[in-house]
A protein has these predicted regions:
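A short, surface-exposed alpha-helical micro-motif characterized by mixed small hydrophobic
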Residues: 100-102
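Catalytic Walker B motif of ABC-type/P-loop ATPase nucleotide-binding domains
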Residues: 58-61
């Protein structure tokens, strides 16, 4: 906020409190350094920072990387909830199929040097070896409950 706005310190502090609590952190987490936070708390603090300027679009790069399955599922739910309540567009790079299923309405994949964007249901209809292996292979079965 300091770098991109001319808001008063008091107003910046209030915005920080709102964003920190919005992502499920206690207010006092806003006063801590990253090294003083757990991995999951750091992810949430980063998300609060990304939301500080009220963007319409949020870009996330492997948002659940390094989180345990419970923490990853909770973070997925948080992203989906914020996406819906704030009307956010979330552009996400991930290899986590559980996150894809939990968060994404549309998915983009690179196939034969072409980008294909569609819903998961439509992507699964594509008769392409990579699509079938990636979304129906052994690692995908757990995510899809197959």
């Amino acid at each position: 906020l300091k770098e991109y706005t001319d808001l008063s310190p008091k107003l910046m502090r209030e915005i920080t409190k709102v964003k920190v609590t919005m992502v499920g952190l206690p207010v006092e987490a806003g006063d801590k350094y990253p090294g003083q936070l757990s991995g999951g708390m750091r992810k949430r603090a980063g998300l609060a920072r990304a939301l500080a300027l009220d963007p319409a679009i949020v870009f996330l790069d492997e948002p659940t990387a390094g989180l345990d399955p419970i923490g990853a599922a909770n973070f997925d739910q948080l992203i989906r909830s914020l996406q819906q309540s704030l009307g956010l567009t979330v552009v996400m790079v991930t290899h986590d199929l559980d996150s894809l299923i939990a968060i994404c309405d549309r998915i983009a994949v690179l196939i034969d040097k072409k980008i294909v964007v569609d819903t998961m249901a439509e992507l699964l209809k594509i008769d392409h070896p990579w699509i079938q292996e990636y979304f129906r292979g052994p690692r995908a079965r757990a995510a899809f409950g197959n």
